UniProtKB/Swiss-Prot annotation:
Localization: Cell inner membrane
Molecular function terms, GO-annotated: ATP binding; P-type potassium transmembrane transporter activity
Protein name per the record: Potassium-transporting ATPase KdpC subunit
Function (record text): Part of the high-affinity ATP-driven potassium transport (or Kdp) system, which catalyzes the hydrolysis of ATP coupled with the electrogenic transport of potassium into the cytoplasm. This subunit acts as a catalytic chaperone that increases the ATP-binding affinity of the ATP-hydrolyzing subunit KdpB by the formation of a transient KdpB/KdpC/ATP ternary complex.
C-alpha cells in the first residue's frame, strides 16, 4: 500500500508539473518575451491576417513574385501536409516535375539566365516562405513588366526585403516572398 500511495503521489506531482505548470510557464514567458513569434508571426493588413512570415503561400497571379514550389500534395502550402517530396534524384517523377517547372519559367520569364534551383525544387518542408535574392532578381523583369514599374524600382524593393542572418556566417541572404509581394501591392497595386 505504501508503494501504491507514493507512486500515485509521484504520478500526480509529475502530471501537475509537466502537464500544467511547465506548459503554462512557457506559454506565459513566450507571450511576454516574444509575443509576435508566440502567435505564429502573423502578418496583418487592414486588421486582417494575410499570412505568416513563416509559411509560404501560392502566388499564381501575374505580377507577383513566386516562392519555392510546394511539396504538399493535396493543396499548395498546406501546413497540415508539411513534408518533403522524398523523391530521389534518380526518380523519373522528380525529373518530370523539374522539367515542367523549368518550362513554366522559360515561358513566363524572358530571361536567358539559368533558372535558380530553388524555383525548380521544393524545400524539405514544402512550406518555405523565402527565396534567395538571386531567385527574386530572376523574376524581377517579369514582375516589373506586369506591374508597369521600372526594373530599378523592383530591384530596390528586393534589396530592401533581403534579410541576412546574424551572425552572417550562418545561412544565406533570403527574401520573404509574402512581405515582398505585400510591399509591391503598397507601392503599385495590380488593377
Amino acid at each position: 500500500m505504501r508503494y501504491l500511495r507514493s507512486s500515485l503521489f509521484l504520478f500526480l506531482l509529475l502530471l501537475l508539473v509537466t502537464g500544467l505548470a511547465y506548459p503554462l510557464l512557457t506559454t506565459v514567458l513566450a507571450q511576454w518575451l516574444f509575443p509576435t513569434q508566440a502567435n505564429g508571426s502573423l502578418i496583418y493588413r487592414d486588421n486582417a491576417v494575410v499570412g505568416s512570415s513563416l509559411i509560404g503561400q501560392s502566388f499564381s497571379r501575374t505580377g507577383y513574385f513566386q516562392g519555392r514550389p510546394s511539396a504538399t500534395s493535396d493543396a499548395p502550402y498546406n501546413a497540415l501536409a508539411s513534408g518533403g517530396s522524398n523523391l530521389a534524384a534518380s526518380n523519373p517523377a522528380l525529373d518530370k516535375q523539374i522539367g515542367e517547372r523549368a518550362a513554366y519559367w522559360h515561358q513566363a520569364v524572358s530571361n536567358q539566365q539559368p533558372i535558380p534551383a530553388e524555383l525548380l525544387t521544393a524545400s524539405g518542408s514544402g512550406l518555405d516562405p523565402q527565396i534567395s535574392p538571386e531567385a527574386a532578381r530572376y523574376q524581377a523583369l517579369y514582375v516589373a513588366q506586369a506591374r508597369g514599374m521600372s526594373l530599378q524600382q523592383i530591384q530596390q524593393l528586393i534589396d530592401r526585403f533581403t534579410e541576412t542572418s546574424k551572425p552572417t556566417f550562418i545561412g544565406q541572404p533570403t527574401v520573404n516572398v509574402l512581405l515582398l509581394n505585400l510591399a509591391l501591392d503598397e507601392e503599385k497595386p495590380l488593377p
